[in-house]
Amino acid sequence: MSATPDPRLKAETLTIRTLTGFDETVRVLGSKSYTNRYLAIASLSGQETVIDNALLSDDTVYFSRAIETFGHVTCDIDHATARIRVTPTGRPMRAPSEDIFVGGAGTPLRFLISMAGHADGTTIITGNARMQERPMGDLLKALPALGVDATAVRGNGSPPVRVVGGSFKGGATSISGAVSSQFTSSLIINALRAQTDTEITISDDLVSKPYVEMTLAGLAEMGVSVDRDGYRRFTVPSGQQARGGQVTVEPDASGMSYFLAAAAILQSRVVIPGIGAGSHQGDVHLVQALERMGCRTEVGDDSITVTGGPLRGIDIDMEAMPDVVPSLAIVAAYAEGTTRITNIASLRVKECDRIAAVTTELRKMGIDVEEHSDAMYITGGTPHGAVIDTYDDHRIAMTFAIGGLRTEGVVIKDPGCVAKSFPAFWQTLDTLHPDLESTK
């Protein structure tokens, strides 16, 4: 994909043109979750690391620049080759003189809170208006037992967060897993540089478990072992050093989901190369959900193929793959019967309240949606065109763009918000249908 910025990212609206079908191989950019994890691990390894097929998006660029402010590494980004080179400077980690601002990047902010515990001095970490509403309290409560003083500046459990660092000694702590698995991943990764063994006990059920599996897989690939008792306890032995070298990021399963959804609703065929049965990304399991809804699927070692068919509603617990709930929801809008998507309370505290956003925008398109605190019941029908509000949320924009491939008159407001995770989304969509029209 060209490194030249897509002018559609600057448009106020984007009108999606319909198409009748397609049979295409679509190459999806690297995983955002893995790129963030490799960046964090590499920055703590003390060795040069090259991250190939990295996702270069708003989130990962914010994270790269934030890591550099501690002074111990440089992160050289090559947009032409989708590569990030992380190189130690030989200097110790020190708190930056300026606040660290990460925009809407939730995973980087949560990783940085723990990382700042290794940096001498006081670090302030903050983000955009929505980020300043998102909960960090469970992580802030867990860090003092490991020697790190981390507090919400306004006392509300949300950013800005103040961290007094140089003190991440390790030891034992407990943390709730009910709000976000990113807190657990943050502690596990940053325990890599703790002075003693670090034991992390999960005090209740852990949501979004596959994301912790991705953290453990990334650490293992870079030579770090973590002892575990299921999802109840994780122990990171001290004295380990992550090895540098070269790592390759597999395609992003969340980004892939939009093209699987397109194949489903258009009774078309799509092949996604570079990702297969061995992936630790929980969002890969959307394939099984689409199969239950009537699609034909093939999951090989290095590719995934989905062919759409007559769609029917299903009942499904999506707790393990919350990021692809919007993708499933747009498919449900075209399915016969009702799709009941449950156990998705975590969507209330994403870039927007995604349960409310998906419900509102599907209703605009004439679809009956029953909204619950942690669920959506979507009764399929014949959606009509609508002007879609995107709530500064990349996943809402991409989801409803897929609906616009089948339904005439779908207009996406603020199409540039996709840059958070998939800046080449509109160009990738062109591989299915080249005729997209932007209006100013």
From Swiss-Prot:
PROSITE patterns: EPSP_SYNTHASE_2 (PS00885). GO terms for biological process: amino acid biosynthetic process; aromatic amino acid family biosynthetic process; chorismate biosynthetic process. It catalyses: 3-phosphoshikimate + phosphoenolpyruvate = 5-O-(1-carboxyvinyl)-3-phosphoshikimate + phosphate. Keywords: Amino-acid biosynthesis, Aromatic amino acid biosynthesis, Cytoplasm, Transferase. It comes from the Bacteria. The keyword Transferase applies. This is 3-phosphoshikimate 1-carboxyvinyltransferase 2. It comes from Streptomyces coelicolor (strain ATCC BAA-471 / A3(2) / M145). The gene is aroA2.
